[in-house]
Amino acid sequence: PDLVISVHMNKFSDANRRGPQVFFQRGDKESKRFADNIQTALNAFVGNDKHAALSGDFFICQCAPVPSVIVECGFLSNKEEERLLLNADYREQLSESIVRGVFLYLYSK
């Protein structure tokens, strides 16, 4: 593969947390650029500019020989966001935003 995107739903003890969050492998500059582009597209979709892509040590990203990210689509622990994530139209728009982020990454090299 040329890129790896692992898609998840998030859950957190603070039920007020919401919004998509993108993670990348610490120290991987290309994955950071990839994550930043997806996070920007997701932030535009949900109307939130507070989230920045976050680094960490993630097994799936460590194993990938190509730029890789983890996309947490939202927090199931937030009842309002859970309701949105259960809506097929919302999920389609969310996935289209991820695709926009991929295009931003691919065409901004």
Language-model segment annotations:
Residues 1-109:
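Active-site-proximal helix/loop segments of hydrolytic enzymes
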